[in-house]
């Protein structure tokens, strides 16, 4: 008869006890930053009864990161052209106008202006 194999829970408990005895530090888990919770909140505002798969969330997260990097790079370039060392909301606004097409840029600028106004009024 083969020997009994310990369950996963028992193995984890045994390894924790071993680590505690030998004075080893527990390996700290690295936090993964993403926009997932914010994407989910917006999805629920727009379509409350709709869900999103993890693969679709990963794609959306990549999209937000890509757009963020493009806007930051363009704003940095604009600040450099104008011999400025600070990226202000004006550079961000101009970068958005340059990167996004037509109506999308108008909506993005109006939403951005609204967000900045809300932030400054709450201070």
From Swiss-Prot:
Pfam families: Histone (PF00125)
Region listing for Disordered, in residue ranges: 1-31
Cross-link (Glycyl lysine isopeptide (Lys-Gly) (interchain with G-Cter in ubiquitin)): 118
Cellular component, GO annotation: nucleosome; nucleus
Residues bearing glycans: 110
Major location (coarse): nucleus
PTM summary: Monoubiquitination of Lys-118 gives a specific tag for epigenetic transcriptional activation and is also prerequisite for histone H3 'Lys-4' and 'Lys-79' methylation. GlcNAcylation at Ser-110 promotes monoubiquitination of Lys-118. It fluctuates in response to extracellular glucose, and associates with transcribed genes.
Location within or outside the cell: Nucleus; Chromosome
PROSITE patterns from the UniProt entry: HISTONE_H2B
Keyword Phosphoprotein listed: no
Keyword Hydrolase found: no
Skewed-composition ranges (Basic residues): 9-31
Keyword annotations from UniProtKB, A to Z: Chromosome, DNA-binding, Glycoprotein, Isopeptide bond, Nucleosome core, Nucleus, Ubl conjugation
An annotated Gene Ontology molecular function: protein-containing complex binding
Role summary: Core component of nucleosome. Nucleosomes wrap and compact DNA into chromatin, limiting DNA accessibility to the cellular machineries which require DNA as a template. Histones thereby play a central role in transcription regulation, DNA repair, DNA replication and chromosomal stability. DNA accessibility is regulated via a complex set of post-translational modifications of histones, also called histone code, and nucleosome remodeling.
Family of the protein in this entry: Belongs to the histone H2B family.
Binding partners and assembly: The nucleosome is a histone octamer containing two molecules each of H2A, H2B, H3 and H4 assembled in one H3-H4 heterotetramer and two H2A-H2B heterodimers. The octamer wraps approximately 147 bp of DNA.
Name under which the protein is recorded: Histone H2B
Species, as recorded: Platynereis dumerilii (Dumeril's clam worm)
């Amino acid at each position: 008869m083969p020997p009994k194999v310990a369950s996963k829970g028992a193995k984890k408990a045994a390894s924790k006890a071993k680590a505690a005895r030998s004075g080893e530090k527990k390996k700290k888990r690295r936090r993964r930053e993403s926009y997932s919770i914010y994407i989910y909140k917006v999805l629920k505002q727009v379509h409350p009864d709709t869900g999103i798969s993890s693969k679709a969330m990963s794609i959306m997260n990549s999209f937000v990161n890509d757009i963020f990097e493009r806007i930051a790079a363009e704003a940095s370039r604009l600040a450099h052209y104008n011999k400025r060392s600070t990226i202000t909301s004006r550079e961000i606004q101009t970068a958005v106008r340059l990167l996004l097409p037509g109506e999308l840029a108008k909506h993005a600028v109006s939403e951005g202006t609204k967000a900045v106004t809300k932030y400054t009024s709450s201070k």
